[in-house]
Amino acid sequence: MQETLLEFFKKTGRPHRLEEILHRFGLEKREAKAHLKALVARGLLEKKGSRYFLANRVQGPLSLHRDGYGFVRLPEGDLFVPPGYTGDAWPGDLVEARVMPPGRDGRPWGVVERVLKRARERLVGTLDFRKGRALLLPDEPNLPELPLAPEGLEGLKRGSRIVVQVHYGKRPYGTFLAYLGEGEAPETETEAVIAKYGLRAEFPEEVLKEAEAIPLEIPEAELRRREDFRGLRVFTIDGVDAKDFDDAIHVERLPGGYRIGVHIADVSHYVKEGSLLDQEAFLRGTSVYLPGRVLPMLPERLSNGVCSLRPGEDRLVLSVLVDLTEDLKVKRVRFREGVIRSVARLTYTEVEAFAEGFGLPEEHAFLAEDLRLLLDLTQRMREKRLKEGALDFAFPEVKVEVGEEGELHLIPQAEPKARSLIEELMLLANRLVAEYLVQKGLPGLFRVHEEPVQDAYEKLRQALARLGYTLPPKLSGHALQKALLASRGRPEEPVVAYLVLRS
């Protein structure tokens, strides 16, 4: 009945007296008052005098400033919450706030009335002791110091990095869960990141057992069922320190054109829907790359074993075979379950050196012609995309390496031609797969970059004008690309790229 009453208030959009409710719904006075009182207690209705009306409340995540004020993040615009009105909420908590009448500045403001969902159950921080009491100094900014229960802290020193379980209430406190290390050593920071985001560092025993049960040899019947690409010069290009190789490529010259093959490791053959491996991969979502450490989505037997396209070993793949004309128009596309035997494992460094005019290592010299052709084709593909209005953001990529003594090194990734080769081929394959899914009405996950709305574009025009770049009044992809290219090598290049990306 309460939901029915609530819908009635929403539909009419005005206050109602108790007598109106009694007449409209034919309720007993005691029953009606009980339902209305419950709705008031739930924060859904308010009572003023003899009238009941919908509570003017909003829900959203709370951001807090160190000075005590905050904002409830809302799609229609953030709601300001003054100091002293944030309740017991912490940054990131999902809260319900009452919207108050506009103040002197003419803007409404809010009062946090309750926390709907906490943003965190655990905290990572540094252990401290004061006046005989243990405290956690959280890593996250704007979080309060948290008193700790003494259990589990025996033998730990001030400055230890730990993980605690947070117990909310009038007087929040934490209980010890795990010791991460001392100070700010890189390995301690890595453990802190794993703990903070709840990453799954280890595989459950039953998942590992399921992985171990997967045979290393491919059954003969499975090989016969698939298209055989083992006679082609299929190879991989990856980073120097890559451990798993999940995509491979090949190219062939055809009369009047070319054939490009993009071969992706067929993980779905080994990870069956609903299996323990599938469930664990679902929980992980992705492999996580940390400095000096990888948390793979699948156990090593798969990620570095049967699903890694290593040279000289038969591997199952899903392949996209694209026939192109001389001017790079798609003439024919085939999707196949296949088997490959990679002939080489190249690195971005080797391919970049080759693109700059140096030779390939002797053992890979037989791929020189294929590589030369692929570099030419993918360069032309890229130029074609840019002519059609695609945007090219030249954000530098940086790799983080950890030295033997724990020192961090930031190493720019400087293999633009080699990486562009792979990027163009993956873009081609993904676009053709997406077109196939749309044509067949099949469900799929699409990554879409929407065009800027005119208001955002106008703000971008004004911002770039202050930097000396002119954009036309009407949105134009070519004009945006022209501005990006004009800023290359100039001090404002990252600012221009960032503004265009944010628009």
State where each predicted segment sits.
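A sequence-level detector of short linear motifs
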Residues: F80-V81, R332, H409-L410
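Short, flexible loop/turn elements at secondary-structure junctions
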Residues: D238-D241, R253-P255, I264, V294, ...
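Short, well-ordered loop/turn elements at secondary-structure boundaries
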Residues: R230-G231, D244-F245, R253-Y258, R284, ...
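Append "with occasional cross-activation on large, charged helical scaffolds in nucleic-acid assemblies
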Residues: F335, Y348-E350, L360, H364-S503
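Charge-lined substrate channels and their catalytic hotspots, especially those that engage the 3′ end
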Residues: M1-I264, S268-D314, R345, T349-A355, ...
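Short loop/turn segments at secondary-structure transitions that flank enzyme active sites
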Residues: N142, L180-E182, K243, V267-S268, ...
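Conserved catalytic alpha/beta cores of large enzymes that bind or transform nucleotide phosphates
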Residues: V288-K387
